[in-house]
Structures are given as structure tokens and as C-alpha cells.
């Protein structure tokens, strides 16, 4: 009888503190959901969104919209000259040479006198200067058209002049290609350079193809596509335009798994993307004895413009700008069979946190184990001492 009373006293002492002392790998599903139900005085606020087919499809479409085909095609260079281009001008004059008999860079070429002018930079006014001819407007003209203009003006002064004009440095129609350790300005030619030509111009990627993104900036619009998709889909390999910026990004993507899963870890995935169902598979799935299938959450910062319109209005009314990133929790109920379809469309993003809460019954079992294990151990010790 004395032993029983002693055990009961110990049980109640432990019970008083056990609720807050039970170890846990994270918050319960109820606590996570309460984040989206805070009063206005509680900051920062959190957007809580239940994942269904409509939500997953909206996020999937936003990801698919990252496509170079939206830019429309570029165009092959027409070979016309523009401000900043550098020209090489050669002039031949039949004997007897009247204008170019000597000086500058002259040499005999058979019976004709050849003169090479210093390289000519197309000025901000769009002109180049030629001796005895003066300033010539060249912007929008091809080298062939420019040489005919020079030849025509020299005919009245030189003896049977012949002219050749070459574009030696294309500074006006080019594309900037940026990669870690190697960046170039690639001139556009009449051949029509494409995105993969820009990738090749810097020697390709320094990382694995699956870990590389290609970002194209045209004006104020930026789109990013996985290099793997760019190679596999010729429609993405569009013609480039003057002023485009092609950037190669080689940082691999990662997400973090936490809670009632195999183990807490950071998991990498390719730039091509990953669905939520694939992510859960990579982290070893949910633990049968611990996890709450109704408490699967994705934590991320979501750009305001990606939220549903009615939710955007709520945040804008609170003073958030269009560039703001909103702390967002997406809740998935894996106990609902329909969620298995939604998860195949729900895209995981870089730096996401996937958290699986403990099931309520698992918490009860943990509590009972926490309470009665020391009591049982204590009772056994008393029995041993009594004996």
C-alpha cells in the first residue's frame, strides 16, 4: 500500500510539468494554423493557405510562365552600322595617283596605290570622317552602302578610286553574357545568334547541367529557365536581340525537411524544379508512428503579386507594397486522397521549409511514456531496495 501511494505522488508531481517538458521536433499542427489567425496587434502576420487543386494549379502555371518563348523571337542582325561601331576603310587609286599618292598608310599594289585609313569610330552623331570627303553619315547603312558613298564622292577627285569598308568591331549590336569567372560581349551577326550560342561563348556552365539556370534579361523583363530545359526544348532557344543580357546561375536549389520525417536535412534539387510529392519522397516520406497526415506544411516567403487577388488587397490595405514578400504557410491534408494530385502540381521553391507535425495520438503516447517511464523505474528501484 505504501508503495502504491508513493508511485501516485510521483505521478502527480511529474504530471504538473510534463505537458511543457515533453520533447518535440517542432510546433503542432494547431500551433501552425494559429499563425494565420493572429490579431492585428501581433506581428509579423502570416498568410495561411490550404492547398487544393486550384491553388496548386495556379502556382504551377506561374512556374511554367518562366519561359523564353514569351519574349517572342529576336532577329538576325541586318549588318547595318550604328553608333560605337569601328570601321576599317581601304582606298585604292589607279596611277597616276592624284589624291593618295603618299602619306597615311600607303603601299603599291600592282599598278594601283593602296591607302589604309586609321580605324574609324562611328561618332555620337552617327558619322565617320574620310580625307577629301569629309563627314559621312553611316548609321543604318551597311558597310557596302558606305563604300559606294565614299567611292562616289572620290570619283571627281581621284583617279578611278576603289573602296572597301569592313566592320572590325561591332559595339552597337551585341549581347552581354555573364558567368562566374568569364563574361563577354558577344556581337550579333547576320547568322542569327541564339541563347545557347551565348552559353557556348563563355565556355558553357562550370557546374552540372541540372544545377544551372539561364536568365535572360530583355529591357525590364527577366525570365529564368533551367539549362536542362533549354537544351531539351528548341523552342526556348530563341534568337537574341541587341542589348540582351544572358546570365548563367549555377547555385543548386535546396529545401529543408523538418518534423516527423526520416530526419531533418537540407536536400538539393535541380534547377528544373521539384514537385511537393517528389520532395516528400526524397526526404523519406512521413513517419507512420509520429506524423500527422493532416499537418503537412510548406513555409516560404511569397511575393505579394503571387497571392490570390483578394489576399493581395488585404496586405496592400495594411501598407505592404507590390514588391513585398509575405511569410506564407501552405497546408496540405494528405489524409484526403485528392491532395495526392495537388501535390504533383505544387512546385517546391528554393529555400522552402517542409514541416510535418506530430499526430495528436503520438503526442499522447509520448506523454504517457514520459510520465510512466520514470515512475516505473522508480517503483522498480523501490522494490529492489525493499527486497
Swiss-Prot record:
One of its GO terms (cellular component) is cell outer membrane. Keywords: Capsule biogenesis/degradation, Cell outer membrane, Ion transport, Lipoprotein, Membrane, Palmitate, Polysaccharide transport, Porin, Signal, Sugar transport, Transmembrane, Transmembrane beta strand, Transport. Pfam families: Poly_export (PF02563), SLBB_2 (PF22461). It is a multi-pass membrane protein. Residues 40-53, 90-113, 142-144, 168-174 are extracellular. It comes from the Bacteria. The keyword Ion transport applies. GO terms for biological process: monoatomic ion transport. The keyword Protein transport does not apply. Belongs to the BexD/CtrA/VexA family. Disulfide bonds: none annotated. Coiled coil: none annotated. It is found in: Cell outer membrane. Involved in transport of capsular polysaccharides to the cell surface. May function as a membrane anchor for capsular polysaccharides. Possible porin properties. The lineage of its organism: Bacteria, Pseudomonadati, Pseudomonadota, Betaproteobacteria, Neisseriales. The gene is ctrA. Residues 19-29, 64-79, 124-131, 155-157, 185-387 are periplasmic. A lipid is attached at residue 19 (S-diacylglycerol cysteine). It comes from Neisseria meningitidis serogroup A / serotype 4A (strain DSM 15465 / Z2491). GO terms for molecular function: polysaccharide transmembrane transporter activity; porin activity. Residues 1-18 form the signal peptide. A lipid is attached at residue 19 (N-palmitoyl cysteine). This is Capsule polysaccharide export outer membrane protein CtrA. The chain crosses the membrane at residues 30-39, 54-63, 80-89, 114-123, 132-141, 145-154, 158-167, 175-184. PROSITE patterns: PROKAR_LIPOPROTEIN.
Amino acid at each position: 500500500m505504501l508503495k502504491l501511494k508513493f508511485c501516485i505522488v510521483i505521478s502527480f508531481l511529474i504530471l504538473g510539468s510534463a505537458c511543457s517538458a515533453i520533447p518535440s521536433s517542432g510546433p503542432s499542427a494547431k500551433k501552425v494554423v494559429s499563425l494565420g489567425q493572429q490579431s492585428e496587434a501581433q506581428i509579423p502576420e502570416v498568410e495561411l493557405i490550404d492547398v487544393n487543386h486550384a491553388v496548386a494549379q495556379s502556382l504551377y502555371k506561374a512556374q511554367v510562365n518562366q519561359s523564353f518563348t514569351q519574349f517572342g523571337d529576336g532577329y538576325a542582325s541586318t549588318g547595318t552600322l550604328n553608333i560605337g561601331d569601328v570601321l576599317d576603310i581601304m582606298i585604292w587609286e589607279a596611277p597616276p595617283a592624284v589624291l593618295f599618292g603618299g602619306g597615311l598608310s600607303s603601299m603599291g599594289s600592282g599598278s594601283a596605290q593602296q591607302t589604309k585609313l586609321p580605324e574609324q569610330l562611328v561618332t555620337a552623331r552617327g558619322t565617320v570622317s574620310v580625307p577629301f570627303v569629309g563627314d559621312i553619315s553611316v548609321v543604318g547603312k551597311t558597310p557596302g552602302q558606305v563604300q559606294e558613298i565614299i567611292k562616289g564622292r572620290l570619283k571627281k577627285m581621284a583617279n578611278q578610286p576603289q573602296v572597301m569598308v569592313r566592320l572590325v568591331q561591332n559595339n552597337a549590336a551585341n549581347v552581354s553574357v555573364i558567368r562566374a569567372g568569364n563574361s563577354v560581349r558577344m556581337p550579333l551577326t547576320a547568322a542569327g545568334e541564339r541563347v545557347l550560342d551565348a552559353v557556348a561563348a563563355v565556355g558553357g556552365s562550370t557546374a552540372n547541367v541540372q544545377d544551372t539556370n539561364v536568365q535572360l534579361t530583355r529591357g525590364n523583363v527577366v525570365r529564368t529557365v533551367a539549362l536542362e530545359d533549354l537544351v531539351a526544348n528548341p523552342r526556348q532557344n530563341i534568337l537574341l536581340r541587341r542589348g540582351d543580357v544572358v546570365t548563367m546561375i549555377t547555385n543548386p536549389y535546396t529545401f529543408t525537411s523538418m518534423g516527423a520525417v526520416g530526419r531533418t536535412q537540407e536536400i538539393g534539387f535541380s534547377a528544373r524544379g521539384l514537385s511537393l510529392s517528389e520532395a516528400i519522397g526524397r526526404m523519406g516520406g512521413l513517419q507512420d508512428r509520429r506524423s500527422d497526415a493532416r499537418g503537412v506544411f510548406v513555409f516560404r516567403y511569397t511575393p505579394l503579386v503571387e497571392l490570390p487577388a483578394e489576399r493581395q488587397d488585404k496586405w496592400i490595405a495594411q501598407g505592404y507594397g507590390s514588391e513585398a514578400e509575405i511569410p506564407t504557410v501552405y497546408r496540405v491534408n494528405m489524409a484526403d486522397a485528392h491532395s495526392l494530385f495537388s501535390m504533383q502540381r505544387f512546385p517546391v521553391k528554393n529555400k522552402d521549409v517542409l514541416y510535418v507535425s506530430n499526430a495528436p495520438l503520438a503526442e499522447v503516447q509520448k506523454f504517457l511514456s514520459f510520465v510512466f517511464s520514470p515512475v516505473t523505474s522508480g517503483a522498480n528501484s523501490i522494490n529492489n531496495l525493499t527486497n
